[in-house]
């Protein structure tokens, strides 16, 4: 559906929300009356059996998790009316209120910390936190020579020119400094090319200076790499994320800022002015967010015209330098003569978003202070009015599936509790916001403001994308789920998952998966035993086509039932999953969690934001029972 049709839906949202509440209320009443267990399954409330000791009891409640109920929830949550649920937007806040209303209807207690005078308000379930845009409200870049301004450029959501535009980095800090030309900004000894080694050999420091680098890598006319890569395919140095170049820059020093020269090439789409206009439009949307100020220096894309003005005092030009490097494959680096770059920025104010937390108190007086946390993120990518056709990213698989699964899990646990089989340990459900912005909701909760003390958090179970299929699984082999853990930290969780799958007759192939960036990372960083369920990166990943109709609801129900059995086992077994003994560990510094950008090998002496990819740094421990990268 196009954006023009979205604005008419506010009244319809409220109507559909009311109908959804009525549907769920009716469904709950019907299934509650049908879920009374036979007498032979009765037991004292504080002695609820585990899945391994009485699998028949667990199966009874598993079967209340149905494809129909999951579909009913997902077709609503991932509809156009929520406008893609982008963090901080109206759609995300409507989704948060929907989730809170569902938890209230199911009988779960609120566990948020939002200030409210009405304990029955949906906000009682909210954990609000502040995020910041990674683009400035306005930026100005000036080129100074002998104290006079020789060129200037202004960029904002309303204004742009053909000289520069803001790309990334610290969107609040002003910066002034000289200029160092660092070639392509590549440091790759395996490929035999290292601009920063060439600077060091000349005794040139980048500290406190603007570093000018060329986009991409040395390219042939057909767009292939001139570097000795396999089959001359492009290397990571040409990635649009700039992750490799940012990592090399941070390892080389502490520059004042970065000037990325974008020139006409086989990889550049449109003119520089076209790209500046697109960046200006993008700045009007929410865009990338952070929990605070970025520690990476401000980075601007600059045109060849502006770059040549900066290099004029040195008697050099971009095309001349690029030609020399491409022909010789040897770095051309130098400190520019008689020129200073000065920038000033105006920052947007903070924006608020919310995690949603709901709580089931444990039934065992000895164990109820211990908590099993079940998580999924409910935000997605929002909408993009510049697209032709469908402009809404509905996020059905990512992570509408995990979100509706948490509601069904909550309902199944509450049914069991009303029948006298409440979990011995407490269970906390958290639906995180801003996962798509860099797992910000879970980082805020686990690293800054855990509303249940982490020492009482015995395990975390995360679901992210559990209803679609990745390209590795053709139609005949789609009865699978990826199980992700981390060595000894997750060993007992994964074993419990395997045992309950067999005992409760769930027909799923368990496949070991890689540790995708998702909300489990920050619980892992706090050394909390965890398990993460996913069906991988689907064909429609981060596309408007990620719609409810693409989901296999029978498969989603099987995965959700498996998660329920695992959570039941952990919540009711006598011993909590064995965790790493913190007293045996040494804090070595802080690293980026495994984000896929390759920046998790750099160790910092401070907490905060990864200057390369923007994720929140986590503690790095060494010692007994923990690997070097935890």
What residues fall within each predicted segment?
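His/Asp/Glu-rich mid-to-C-terminal helical/loop segments that flank catalytic regions of hydrolases
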Residues: 411, 539-585
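Intrinsically disordered, low-complexity terminal tails/loops enriched in metal-binding residues
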Residues: 585-630
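Metal-dependent peptidase/peptidase-like ectodomains
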Residues: 157-158, 172, 288-289, 295-316, ...
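Extracellular/luminal Protease-associated
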Residues: 155-291, 295-298, 361, 391-394, ...
């Amino acid at each position: 559906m196009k954006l023009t049709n979205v604005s008419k839906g506010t009244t319809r949202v409220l109507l559909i929300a009311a109908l959804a509440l009525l549907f769920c209320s009716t469904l709950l009443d019907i299934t509650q009356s049908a879920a009374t267990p036979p007498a032979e399954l009765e037991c004292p409330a504080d002695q609820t059996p585990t899945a391994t000791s009485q699998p028949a009891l667990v199966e009874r409640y598993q079967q209340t998790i149905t494809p129909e109920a999951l579909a009913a929830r997902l077709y609503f949550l991932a509809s156009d009316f929520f406008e893609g649920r982008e963090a901080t937007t109206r759609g995300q806040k409507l989704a948060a209120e929907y989730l809170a209303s569902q938890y209230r209807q199911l009988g779960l207690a609120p566990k948020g910390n939002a200030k409210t005078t009405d304990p029955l308000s949906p906000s009682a379930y909210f954990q609000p936190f502040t995020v910041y845009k990674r683009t400035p409200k306005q930026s100005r870049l000036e080129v100074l020579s002998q104290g006079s301004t020789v060129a200037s450029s202004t960029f904002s959501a309303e204004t742009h020119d053909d000289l520069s535009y803001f790309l990334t980095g610290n969107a609040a800090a002003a910066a002034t400094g000289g200029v160092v030309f660092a070639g392509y900004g590549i440091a790759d000894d395996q490929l035999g090319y290292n601009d920063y080694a060439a600077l060091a050999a000349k005794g040139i420091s980048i500290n406190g200076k603007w570093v000018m680098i060329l986009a991409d890598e040395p390219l042939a006319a057909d767009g292939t790499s001139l570097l000795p890569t396999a089959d001359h395919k492009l290397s990571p140095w040409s990635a649009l994320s700039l992750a490799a170049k940012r990592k090399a820059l941070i390892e080389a020093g502490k520059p004042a800022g970065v000037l990325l020269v974008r020139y006409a090439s086989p990889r550049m789409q449109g003119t520089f002015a076209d790209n500046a206009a697109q960046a200006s439009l993008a700045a009007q949307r929410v865009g990338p967010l952070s929990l605070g100020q970025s520690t990476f220096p401000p980075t601007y894309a600059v045109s060849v015209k502006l770059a040549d003005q900066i290099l004029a005092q040195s008697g050099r030009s971009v095309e001349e330098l690029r030609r020399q490097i491409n022909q010789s494959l040897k770095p051309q680096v130098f400190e520019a003569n008689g020129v200073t770059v000065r920038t000033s920025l105006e920052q947007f104010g903070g924006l608020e978003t919310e995690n949603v937390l709901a709580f089931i108190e444990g039934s065992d007086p000895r164990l109820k202070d211990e908590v099993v946390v079940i998580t999924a993120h409910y935000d997605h990518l929002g909408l993009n009015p510049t697209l032709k056709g469908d402009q809404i990213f509905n996020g059905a698989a990512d992570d509408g599936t995990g979100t509706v699964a948490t509601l069904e899990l909550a309902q199944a646990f509450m049914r069991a509790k009303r029948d006298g089989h409440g979990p011995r340990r407490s269970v906390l459900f958290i639906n995180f916001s801003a996962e798509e912005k860099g797992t910000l909701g879970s980082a805020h909760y686990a690293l800054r403001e855990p509303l249940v003390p982490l020492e009482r958090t015995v395990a975390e179970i995360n679901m992210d994308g559990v209803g679609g299929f990745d390209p590795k699984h053709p139609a005949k082999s789609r009865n699978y789920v990826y199980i992700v853990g981390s060595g000894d930290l997750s060993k007992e969780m994964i074993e419990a998952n395997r045992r309950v799958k067999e005992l409760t007759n769930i027909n799923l192939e368990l496949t070991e998966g890689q540790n995708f960036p998702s909300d489990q990372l920050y619980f892992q960083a706090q050394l909390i035993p965890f398990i993460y369920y996913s069906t991988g990166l689907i064909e429609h990943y981060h596309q408007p086509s990620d719609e409810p109709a693409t989901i296999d609801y029978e498969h989603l129900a099987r995965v959700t039932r498996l998660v329920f059995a695992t959570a039941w086992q952990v919540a009711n077994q006598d011993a909590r999953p064995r965790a790493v003994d913190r007293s045996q560990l040494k804090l070595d510094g802080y690293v980026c969690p495994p984000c896929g950008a390759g920046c998790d090998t750099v160790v910092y002496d401070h907490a905060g934001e990864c200057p390369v990819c923007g994720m929140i740094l986590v503690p790095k421990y060494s010692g007994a029972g923990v690997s070097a990268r935890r």
